[in-house]
Amino acid sequence: MVKGQGNVVAQNKKAHHDYTIVETIEAGIVLTGTEIKSVRAARITLKDGYAQIKNGEAWLINVHITPYDQGNIWNQDPDRTRKLLLKKREIEKISNELKGTGMTLVPLKVYLKDGFAKVLLGLAKGKHDYDKRESIKRREQNRDIARQLKNYNSR
């Protein structure tokens, strides 16, 4: 698990709804100068993003970073694939877990840690519709219990 997370810039709110997160991994992102300025301004979208292992390297795909306003000619394509910085052992471990198991790698958060952009990846398994309904039902029951306890304790 990740210890100290710095300034959270973006979160993938649908990830916990659509997937069951098995494990989390912290990775650095290779960004250009104008991209890091956009990330610091919280102009990043993780909605449809995912990560993939190709040729022994990890890549972040479909993550949109809006071009920096004053970037003019140095701005990159907003939807380009970006390299993730992981150790070889971590990449091998992830690729072994991803092989033929129906698992995927989903970005959960992007945050700044000591001036560097980091992404929290979740090793995830997709949920079925009935799993989603069950988790919603469980969440509502917990809210009702908490509400009743609050009312009971305030008497």
From Swiss-Prot:
GO terms for cellular component: cytosol. The keyword RNA-binding applies. One of its GO terms (molecular function) is RNA binding. Keywords: Cytoplasm, RNA-binding. PANTHER family: SSRA-BINDING PROTEIN (PTHR30308:SF2), TMRNA-BINDING COMPONENT OF TRANS-TRANSLATION TAGGING COMPLEX (PTHR30308). NCBIfam families: PRK05422.1, smpB. This is SsrA-binding protein.
